[in-house]
């Protein structure tokens, strides 16, 4: 058992090295502004996926520690919101239980969740042999809004504009029909019911 753990740790260290070496190139290839994902890469660590809670919140494990990670840089639809289940399913396909990814932690939020960035290995996403920041991938696929690290000011990046124009993901019904998670949480049950009628996946 001890030998198996040693082999696993060596493999995780190799993955960290490969991801850190390629993260800058991977982000530039997507045309993403250099953000937390790149700045924190040197301090990143290998982590195993335990489960996906929703499109931007996951249970992760690093060593013996298990923690809840809130993905920085994006805001994805709530589970009871239009396109929420589809966004979560899209992420769950990328973050299968037991998969090892690179996580750059950046403190805690008001709810005690760990804030951070996630880099996907090349075996998970085809990106010319380079790792891909999960936050950027969600925006490109239309499953999240791009936002700054403190989640207060929307950053209408080129990827989000392209996703809107192409009608990908939550933009299927047009930008005017998309409701941000923050607005959704403020709605009462009657308003939510009205928004659930009409355009669906």
Task: Describe each region flagged by the PLM.
Residues 2-201:
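Small beta-barrel nucleic-acid-binding modules, primarily SNase/OB-fold domains
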């Amino acid at each position: 058992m001890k030998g198996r753990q040693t082999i696993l740790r060596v493999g995780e260290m190799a993955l960290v090295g490969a991801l850190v070496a390629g993260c800058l190139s991977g982000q530039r290839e997507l045309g993403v502004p250099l953000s937390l994902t790149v700045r924190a890469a040197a301090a990143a660590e290998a982590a195993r996926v335990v489960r996906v809670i929703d499109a931007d919140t996951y249970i992760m494990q690093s060593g013996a520690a298990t923690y809840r990670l809130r993905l920085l840089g994006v805001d994805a639809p709530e589970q009871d919101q239009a396109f929420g289940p589809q966004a979560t399913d899209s992420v769950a396909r990328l973050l299968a239980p037991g998969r090892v990814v690179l996580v750059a932690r950046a403190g805690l939020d008001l709810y005690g969740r760990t804030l951070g960035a996630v880099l996907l290995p090349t075996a998970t996403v085809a990106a010319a042999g380079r790792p891909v920041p999960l936050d950027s991938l969600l925006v490109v696929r239309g499953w999240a809004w791009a936002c700054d690290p403190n989640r207060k000011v929307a950053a209408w990046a080129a990827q989000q504009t392209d996703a809107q124009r192409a009608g990908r993901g939550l933009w299927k019904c047009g930008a005017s029909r998309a409701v941000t998670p923050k607005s959704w949480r403020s709605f009462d049950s009657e308003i939510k019911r009205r928004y659930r009628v009409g355009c669906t996946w």
